[in-house]
Amino acid sequence: MIKELIQTSYLFGSNAPYVEDLYEQYLEDPASIDEKWRQFFDRLQQTPASDGRVETPDVPHAPIIEAFAQRAMQPRGVSCPVSEGDLEIARKQVAVQSIIGAYRFLGARWANLDPLHRRERPKIPELEPSFYGLSDADMDTVFSAANTYFGADKMTLRDLIAALRQTYCGDLGIEFMYISDPVIKRWWQQKLEPNRSVPSYDNAAKKRILQRLTAAEGLERYLHTKYVGQKRFSLEGGESFIVSIDEVVEAGAEQGIEEMVIGMAHRGRLNVLVNTLGKSPSELFAEFEGKYKSKDLPAGDVKYHNGFSSDVVTAAGPIHLALAFNPSHLEIVDPVVVGSVRARQDRRDDPKGRRVMGVMVHGDAAFAGQGVVMETLNLADTRGYGTGGTMHIVINNQIGFTTSDPR
């Protein structure tokens, strides 16, 4: 084998232009090249095609290439005159398509995500019509909106921009255009654009959301009033998380999830224990008062490190929830949760992750600042550690961390 490689070493890739030039000379005049090369090309001409057919002898390539080059330079026989007005309309339509793409890509950066208005939203030139050469005079011009899902094939520029801003720059910031799969991107567009990113709830759903928000806020107020000054890492500023995690549990059960492992740090943990996993409030209050002694925790540990597990009843049936224990290293629980999920999947013979899933709850500052988060993300889709996907929820209550400002 090595001998064969040595004998054909002159055919390696870097010699391709030289061999091609020799082959062209051979086709024009076989006697003009060296005898060994002539024999090599003779054998090449006699080699049958992959389907067994014997091809007709090759002909010189240069005249054919030159003929096509000359033809490409000749003017086309058919011309289609276009007026300046048509060209301007086409240019503006292209500009409109660029605006649609810009809002899908960049709209989240201009979304209204700061209810405290601590800083102004950044100016993004790409979201302004003037960036694409459009002016106020074009605002009432009708353009094609066929590649959107706003419910109309044509819209005035004014209405189109209003719809884009409501969808992508409202109280929701949606980043999805980085996804490489066009089917998934289209799915997001079809979910967001018809309702302008404004969910529609019936009265029963609104009452349920109000009840859950009241439960979350009520617990925080009670703890603040009853146990003044005790560390509890309040959920205040992120109360809607309780509604969110409820929806995750309900939707998971509908999709056939039987177990859900949750990992989170301190912020809002006590609220999740009571309002999501169903821990008895009396047990929590006893921990605040130092009366409750857990046989599972060593002496000196704190209540907001506690884990818990329970079976929760959903509309689709029961689901087992497990909140992992977590030490004061905020995000160190992340790989523990992934490992627990994978072990439970292996135990249930669930290689695709259809019956067990993980949910990780992060603080906004910890998610960005702690390396273990990204290290855990790097385990995704690996053969030994993949779980089929994890739900990540980042709570941003605009605190970050509760130390005083040294300035």
Task: Give each language-model segment a name.
Residues 44-241, 257, 294:
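Extended, charge-enriched "interface" segments that sit outside catalytic cores
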